[in-house]
Amino acid sequence: MSVELWQQCVELLRDELPAQQFNTWIRPLQVEAEGDELRVYAPNRFVLDWVNEKYLGRLLELLGENGSGIAPALSLLIGSRRSSAPRAAPNAPVSAAVAASLAQTQAHKAAPTPAAVEPIAVAAAEPVLVDELAEPSSRDSFDAMAEPASAPASSGRAEQRTVQVEGALKHTSYLNRTFTFDTFVEGKSNQLARAAAWQVADNPKHGYNPLFLYGGVGLGKTHLMHAVGNHLLKKNPNAKVVYLHSERFVADMVKALQLNAINEFKRFYRSVDALLIDDIQFFARKERSQEEFFHTFNALLEGGQQVILTSDRYPKEIEGLEERLKSRFGWGLTVAVEPPELETRVAILMKKADQAKVELPHDAAFFIAQRIRSNVRELEGALKRVIAHSHFMGRDITIELIRESLKDLLALQDKLVSVDNIQRTVAEYYKIKISDLLSKRRSRSVARPRQVAMALSKELTNHSLPEIGDMFGGRDHTTVLHACRKINELKESDADIREDYKNLLRTLTT
């Protein structure tokens, strides 16, 4: 198929369209012929999507009418005809919009002819899986070039050709399919967050909107977000579910401004069924991004579309974030994801070992869980090191092998979490002196922090009760035992003590 035929059809389309539409959407297209295939390049994803939805059907019709009477082979790509070969898009099916355009083209015909184009059978798009936890770059999200994949042609009397479009870029999910509710280990620390995420996944638009998950790194916020997205796609494969990091939203907006395509940017992000944005704290002090996200957020909620956000802190505590955004984040449900307790850490290790088809003795899992307390990511990293060490050495996993494979990490943990460090941290937190913790003073303002420090020492170090007592002014081990039991009781009944303990635990282990 010749470029001249394309130019001829474009001139015919020019007569049909208002000048502004033609100059905005058709004029920027570049074309090159390769054998019987015609490759059409759009400057960015938004132009590609718009041409795909609004003009592709008519262009195909004109090409068929003015060509050989056979439906043309057409590729719609992002890039330039002078650029290097585009990267391959993984298993990208023809988008539903193309099929709709082709169906509309056929409907315009009075009767079937050899030039008629029948709708192409479209397979449900699989969510695109990025490599493990790696984020796709902002370039990939906005203007990455991709080699289109062929869609299967449906049977029919007319000769069928594949219309190839850079499929799946339109609403690429970027979901990790291994992050599901089944692979998420539930415990006291994440029970509420998991329940809220499931409610949103099972009843989208009727649950909590927005759902805001916050907590430290590596605690499972991203896992839950992906689990919701995967469940939504499982229920409805045609759902437009988009997961991205907040920095990518900013990068897409900047690119849209550079290309004078901000309206298309708005249309893209406001047309999703569910928008999942990670690490919203990166919007801080980015006024233009906050302004655009504010309007996108409002449009999605007004349209009944689901929004899920995560952050490393409570939304009200994010400095540099506009108050109107903080206020709107509170419209739905805000849930904290806490560091996993010992039992949950053991369960996570056992589940990960089972997934890796590795036998992990319970005492070995308990040993690792006792010493790696900060977050799930570090816990999994430690387990991978142990498994690798076991494999390379040809030995079963034992506590001795764990000590060998994690000796540097364990040494660092022991150095960081010492009784001296705990005493100093607790004293600073309660604004008292370390000497007060070691003294015989029994006033509540000193006794309660001392009990908290003893309980933390019992949980975070390997010292015995008598050793801990000695380091707290020569106290008896029964005093330490009483302090630990008292703090455990207060954590259940006293919200202030519970919050203090969590804050101190987080400070000491991160």
Swiss-Prot record:
Residues 391-510 are annotated as: Domain IV, binds dsDNA. Residues 1-87 are annotated as: Domain I, interacts with DnaA modulators. Residues 140-160 are annotated as: Disordered. GO terms for biological process: DNA replication initiation; regulation of DNA replication. ATP binds at residues 218, 220-222. One of its GO terms (cellular component) is cytoplasm. Residues 174-390 are annotated as: Domain III, AAA+ region. Keywords: ATP-binding, Cytoplasm, DNA replication, DNA-binding, Lipid-binding, Nucleotide-binding. Residues 87-173 are annotated as: Domain II. It is found in: Cytoplasm. InterPro entries: AAA+_ATPase, Chromosome_initiator_DnaA, Chromosome_initiator_DnaA-like, Chromosome_initiator_DnaA_CS, DnaA_C, DnaA_dom, DnaA_N_dom, DnaA_N_sf. NCBIfam families: DnaA (TIGR00362). Plays an essential role in the initiation and regulation of chromosomal replication. ATP-DnaA binds to the origin of replication (oriC) to initiate formation of the DNA replication initiation complex once per cell cycle. Binds the DnaA box (a 9 base pair repeat at the origin) and separates the double-stranded (ds)DNA. Forms a right-handed helical filament on oriC DNA; dsDNA binds to the exterior of the filament while single-stranded (ss)DNA is stabiized in the filament's interior. Domain I is involved in oligomerization and binding regulators, domain II is flexibile and of varying length in different bacteria, domain III forms the AAA+ region, while domain IV binds dsDNA. This is Chromosomal replication initiator protein DnaA. The lineage of its organism: Bacteria, Pseudomonadati, Pseudomonadota, Gammaproteobacteria, Pseudomonadales.
